[in-house]
Amino acid sequence: AVGKSLKGVTSAIFSMRTALVGVAGVAGFGYLVKSSLNATDSLKKTADKIGTTTEALSALRYAAERTGVQTNTLDMAMQRFTRRTAEAAKGTGEAKGAIKELGLDANKLQRLSLDQQMVSLAGAFGNVTNDADRLRIAFKLFDSEGAALVNTLALGEAGLEEMFGRAKTLGLVMSNQASVGVEKANDSFNDMLSIVKGLKDQFSAALAP
């Protein structure tokens, strides 16, 4: 009877362990998917903050990454550039003189999408042959992040457009419509992870002495 009882306990323990492994596996996969959802959710929120589209920002992130610029640096640079371009269009701000020096019109520049604004800048940068002047202008446009973006702008108009096309071909450009869906999916996934965590806690409590 004792042996039969021990056998039953052992079987129960192994069943519980199998269930725990299954839950852990689901949780592990869940966090992997959650990481991807978080990245897209962050892209959408950052694009909204800057006042641009997820298409433009995701393409710019790819071009920046390929020229050695980290995502957070690019995002901050775009926030500052957007604000400074708006100020320049009103005839004020740090970027006013720099935009004029590049031969661009701040009002026309502001009406373009963010990625096309950068294409215009990249084209104009090609006419600035002195490295010190390039750095100085970049600082006026992007503040302290300007130094990092010099290499991105050095791609030129055609080079930057090529990067955008490559990002699209690789499926790295996220549409606004898709990003809205991801925001909703992220909320639903948070609920699912909470349920999984609850199951793990219940199993752990059941195994406790």
What do the predicted segments below correspond to?
Residues 1-11, 15-34, 38-41, 45-55, ...:
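Low-complexity, glycine/alanine/serine/threonine- and acidic/polar-rich repeat/linker tracts characteristic
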